[in-house]
Amino acid sequence: MSTMAVVERRKEDIPSAQLVKKEVVYETNGLNVWYGEHHALKHIHLSFYEREITAIIGPSGCGKSTYIKTLNRMIELIPNVRLEGEILYRGRRIFDTSYPVEQLRTQVGMVFQKPNPFPKSIYDNVAYGPRIHGIRDRRRLDEIVEKSLRQAALWEEVKDRLHENALGLSGGQQQRLCIARCLAVEPDVILMDEPTSALDPISTAKVEELMGELKTKYSIIIVTHNMQQAARISDRTAFFLNGEVIEYGETKTLFSRPADQRTADYIAGRFG
């Protein structure tokens, strides 16, 4: 499938409320990724907008997680990987040698599929990033920890046990702690790779509610296998298949009136 075949929504298909001009946060132009001889991503062209939740859906092995790892250059940690094309974060080429990867990963946070708190106290988990960036004042750290835990909807549950080991939290609490840890360095974008797949339904609902609150300040890009989740929480959705973007558009329209038969078949559960 050629790049030009990716389905684009016509303006008349999108409600006027969705046509408000928004700042582009990320642009991907002609991105190709290979693992050795395996062509994992093929000619990806996508743009993401500020203060929106964008969902990336598709069957296992379609390239979703590979793609999200390119956005903060974690892909470079994988042996024998090769990239071609361009990714711009707020107009700046992220693979440019003048752009320190540490700076990019401060601006673009990442929350993984499995909660991965450090084997430290709840407080030290959240304070870790600010300390790395040179903040030592205890009062300032206290403020950051409380603010981040409040933003992650966790403060009331842990405020009396901040110095207990974070590994003693439930799975859902650990994932919200990881979100708080991400927020503590004040990122611009939050990447989430299957953030609720290991959680129970109640914890999943809390994280989804949290994402809705966070998008008033942050841009969120989430990879999910859960189509119902994508439909519930996202503003836009990209459907990946075999390393290609098949369709990308406003979520309500993509789910109710998909323009490509492969999208319709996937949403209907005919494969995947």
UniProtKB/Swiss-Prot annotation:
Q: Which reaction does it catalyse?
A: phosphate(out) + ATP + H2O = ADP + 2 phosphate(in) + H(+)
Gene this chain is encoded by? pstB
User: Which organism is the protein's source?
Assistant: Geobacillus kaustophilus (strain HTA426)
Arranged from A to Z, the UniProt key words for this protein are: ATP-binding, Cell membrane, Membrane, Nucleotide-binding, Phosphate transport, Translocase, Transport
Q: What is the predominant subcellular site recorded for this chain?
A: membrane
Q: Name one GO cellular component term.
A: plasma membrane
Quote the NCBIfam families the UniProt record gives: 3a0107s01c2
Q: Which SUPFAM superfamilies match?
A: P-loop containing nucleoside triphosphate hydrolases
UniProt binding sites for ATP: 58-65
Q: What protein am I looking at? A: Phosphate import ATP-binding protein PstB
